[in-house]
Amino acid sequence: MVSSPVASRIDAVSRFAREHGWHLMFQDRLGSGHPFDWVGDGVVATIRDDRRQLAYLRHLASLGIPIVDMTCDRPDFPCARVSCNHVEAGRLAAGHFLERNYRSLVFFTIDWGNGRERFWRGFSSAGSPGKWVFSAECPNARWNDWGAVSNWLERKFASAPKPLGALTYSQAESVLLLSAARRLGIRVPEDLGIVSGGEDKALLECQPVPITAVDMDMGRGAYEAAELLQRLMDGEAAPARAVEFPPRRIIARRSTDATVASDKLVRAAIELFASGLKSGVNVESAARALGVSRNTLNRRISAELGRTASAELQRQRLMMAKRLLADPKNKVEYVARMAGFSSASHLGSALRADCGLTPMSFRM
């Protein structure tokens, strides 16, 4: 049996099942407390704070049925675990914001728990971000009262510095944050950058401003969880500690498609870089267009962003390439040309140096 609504997890466990002759039952919510007419040998689950689910899983464990959890939300529940390293995911999100020069950061979540605490630990390693926890500040409100959450966010936004980079724990929280910001006239990404702490392409791409996400490689985690469950069903002892794997990458979308700069010359240079990639803009031509010397432009960009003008231009090329690679219809040669690389191999070398992936592996 598998309990998980995430498509990549379902696909991965289904693949393992086909390869190993499993018969599957999927159950997103337990409803009355147990899956209808299910008798089986093992469970891959996402264990949450659900009283009925916990009671049923305890019952299965008492019968000797092995369970593998794909989350880290309930470390107190005794079972095997395979999950992404949430601390590293938080660090990855912080680095993404800092690369874009967002200096004021906040972690927003509806509730608190072990997974969120681990995200926070990684995110806060990059500085001193704020922490917005709805349940802590509004303990008498229901977590799914979106009107109450939206009104609370309005109060938080009123006193928050801008531009602000916000990491959310879940995809739904990132959509809620975007909706509240748009209702209040807060520009995304110019005034507010948003990163979701989990990827859901169907949800995050279908927003008025598509939302950047940490790719937690849930498909890999689900496949490894299924492999572990098979070993447990074959009689192997459960690992003494949770199995963790690193987050795969940041999937950059428009919600962080900005580089924050207070220097007007630097902002103008960034806009020139971004708009002139296809035509082969370089630092020299940008400096001429802005009426300054190359040295002046380089000095001002370095002072504002902490990197050279050439490094910022290369970063803009890679940002464009990554956005285009996200669409499988775009051939690598087309992506290279549109992003200002001389060839597909030039793009491949730059991408490998940046994140260790080839163009084809990046889009997988």
Residue spans for each PLM region:
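Bacterial carbohydrate/catabolite-sensing allosteric modules
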Residues: 1-47, 51-289, 298, 315, ...
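Basic/polar phosphate-binding segments, predominantly the helix-turn-helix DNA-binding elements
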Residues: 283-313, 336-361
